[in-house]
């Protein structure tokens, strides 16, 4: 797993790397070019951030595209089986709804998504699929101030030998459906068999580089919540919280000392090793309690302070995700209790309005991507996302 660290926001930079892969310099994403991976690790490790990302994805996806629901309804009315294969949009047997789920998830973590489009020799689109966000980097601008490439590589966080990277990096053209442009790209690639299609990049920040994630300003809070969970887990796993001192009489030899410490490790488990200290003292008495003493070392982490910090951290995270109402996070985590149906409904309506712009961006992207598709998916060219209210 890649090793990442939280970055100071004032030091965060988007820069063009001097290294060229496939002949193209690229725009690094983050101070160490590991920003997307860092986001996925920290959001995935924070219960609140992960729940918030799930809420964002749900309200972008809604109930899916109306065209797919209508096709299913028509099949039911005709008392025939719904032929899902009529909506397949790539060789992964995905439908527009399947693609929408992946788009929503990428946007819920990164506020951006990369989508690959392939063409046939009639310049019709033949397949559309989402690329993993963390594998994609924008190419640098050329002498004409044009950014024409996306570099695709599956291990940006662990760059190896430059020649090895260069061999595995894929340079894919940015989206431009003009037949003239496509033909020029095909010729440059050495023919249709070598052509990799194009990549559409939806950036919710609408800037000239990469968007900042929803969790960007609360990365430290995400890390704190992740560490809090780990602290609690380790406490239960090893059977006690805090740090302890084991005091014994002086060992007769190094061998006796190592045997004692090995037995101690085996009894408390590897997870607790760093929470136990062994001290040797001249102790009097023949009884066991006179020879071995176990003393807790007082921790400055108080339960009430711990609870306050956890709540404050969770609230900070929630606010950065469009100020998601707490009731929706409780719903995701199964903690609704006596929450009224009205408050849940109001919260859903609020989030539906909050995500209206994002859904509109996604609808327009789909309408663009499936324009001139070889097998028409939408009879009127529209891709309307159904909402809950």
Task: Describe the residue ranges of each PLM region.
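Generic structural signal for hydrophobic core residues of well-folded globular domains
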Residues: 103, 107, 249, 320-321, ...
């Amino acid at each position: 797993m890649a090793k990442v660290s939280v970055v100071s926001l004032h030091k965060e930079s988007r820069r063009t790397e001097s290294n060229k892969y496939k002949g193209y310099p690229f725009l690094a994403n983050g101070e160490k070019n590991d920003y997307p991976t860092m986001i996925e690790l920290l959001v995935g490790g924070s219960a609140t951030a992960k729940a918030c990302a799930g809420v964002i994805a749900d309200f972008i996806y809604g109930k899916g595209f109306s065209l797919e629901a209508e096709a299913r309804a028509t099949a039911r009315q005709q008392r025939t089986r719904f032929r899902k294969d009529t909506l397949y949009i790539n060789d992964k047997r995905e439908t527009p709804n399947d693609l929408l789920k992946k788009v929503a998830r990428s946007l819920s973590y990164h506020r951006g998504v990369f989508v690959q489009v392939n063409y046939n020799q009639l310049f019709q689109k033949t397949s559309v699929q989402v690329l993993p966000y963390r594998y994609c980097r924008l190419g640098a601008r050329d002498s004409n101030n044009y950014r024409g490439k996306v570099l695709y590589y599956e291990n940006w966080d662990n760059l190896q030998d430059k020649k090895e990277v260069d061999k595995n990096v894929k340079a894919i053209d940015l989206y431009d459906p003009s037949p003239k442009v496509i033909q020029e790209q095909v010729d440059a690639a050495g023919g249709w068999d070598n052509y990799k299609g194009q990549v559409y990049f939806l950036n919710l920040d609408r800037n000239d580089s990469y968007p900042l994630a929803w969790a960007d300003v609360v990365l430290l809070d995400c890390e704190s919540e992740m560490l809090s969970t780990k602290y609690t887990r380790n406490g239960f796993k090893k059977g006690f919280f805090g740090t302890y001192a084991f005091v014994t009489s002086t060992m007769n030899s190094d061998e006796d000392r190592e045997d004692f410490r090995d037995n101690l490790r085996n009894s408390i488990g590897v997870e607790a090793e760093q929470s136990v200290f062994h001290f040797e003292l001249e102790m009097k008495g023949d009884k066991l309690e006179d020879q071995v003493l176990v003393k807790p070392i007082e921790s400055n982490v108080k339960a009430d302070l711990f609870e306050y910090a956890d709540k404050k951290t969770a609230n900070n995270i929630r606010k950065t995700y469009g100020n998601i109402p707490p009731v929706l996070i409780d719903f995701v985590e199964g903690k609704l209790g006596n929450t009224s149906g009205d408050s849940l409904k109001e919260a859903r309506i609020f989030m539906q309005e909050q995500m209206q712009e994002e859904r509109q961006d996604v609808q327009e992207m789909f309408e663009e991507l499936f324009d001139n598709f070889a097998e028409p998916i939408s009879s009127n060219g529209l891709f309307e996302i159904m909402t809950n209210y």
